Amino acid sequence: MKLSIRPFVLGIALCTLIGIVAFGLAKIPFFLSLHLSPLILSVLVGMALAPWYKKSGQIGIIGVLWCGKRLLRLGIVLFGFQVTLQSLLGVGVEGFLIALLVVAGIFTLGSYLGVKLLGLDRETSMLIACGSAVCGAAAILALESLSKTPAHKTAIAVGVVVLFGLLSMFLYPLVYEAGFIPLSPLQEGIYTGATLHEVANVIGASANLPKEAQEAAVIVKMIRVILLVPLLLLLSFTILKHREKGSNEVAIPWFALLFLGAILLGSLFFFPSWLRSLLQSGSLFSLTLAMGALGLVSDFSKLQGVGAKALALGAILWGVLLFGGLGLVKLLA
């Protein structure tokens, strides 16, 4: 028993160290200006250390893999306490419909084009599509946990989604300020929340909008986050069909149901602000360590021939979000 505990603790300690470095980097003005969260920085630090970790014989691999799976799911569940059903009423049926169409359309289109047009493998296509459609890296991690995707594919998808999310975050304020898009402030908020990848991207891009528009942006984004639950439930049956013969077990994403349960609990019962803050910190800490673990076990030898195609898929979906999302907002909002 002692022999198994030591590598387990070493692995967790290594991921914790990566997480601490990521939190430290996130406070540096340069990274603050880019709105890069510790979650994103953690996977970058992990990927930078991946060659060394491979040469070291992957010390503490048991603990690292535990962080990449169990701690990941815990972080996703705790993330649900940041969303309340009451807040969703602020954008009405139109906001919900726009979010639903974006999630369904982008995920379906990305999964299809990645395989049929670009020749990407199915897993990478779905990860990029999910991250673009729902909530960036958090959605990719949720799908990775369900589909048991290799770490290097997850790292590729996260990198692509982060890139185009950052581009949008810097582009949108410039476009709004220049008046290139004929939208009302409220429509700008809905458009921002419906089309940007990460929650942090939405907050950054809407910072200069009126308060009402900022709230609309966050609410629409949170609707997309909630839609992750039914998406994962549907995918659990789709993924089953592509598994090897002899496996009849349905991959029910229990963590997705717990995520929904967290949303309901946070909506129906009073949570003091200190407790909500604690749960939010717990979610961020868990996901940051999980991202570090995924970066650490990334196999760069498997990245060849995939990067350009993955970027192409991300670019296509980015364009559809920009122009298709604008059309939806003009038509429905």
From Swiss-Prot:
Main location: membrane
Family label: Belongs to the UPF0324 family.
Transmembrane region(s): 4-26, 31-53, 59-81, 88-110, 125-147, 154-176, 218-240, 253-275, 310-332
Pfam hit, one: Cons_hypoth698
Keyword vocabulary terms for this entry: Cell membrane, Membrane, Transmembrane, Transmembrane helix
Single GO cellular component term: plasma membrane
Disulfide bonds: none
Keyword field contains Transmembrane: yes
Native organism: Wolinella succinogenes (strain ATCC 29543 / DSM 1740 / CCUG 13145 / JCM 31913 / LMG 7466 / NCTC 11488 / FDC 602W) (Vibrio succinogenes)
Cellular compartment(s): Cell membrane
Protein name from the UniProt record: UPF0324 membrane protein WS2204
UniProt KW Transmembrane keyword: yes
Membrane topology classification: Multi-pass membrane protein
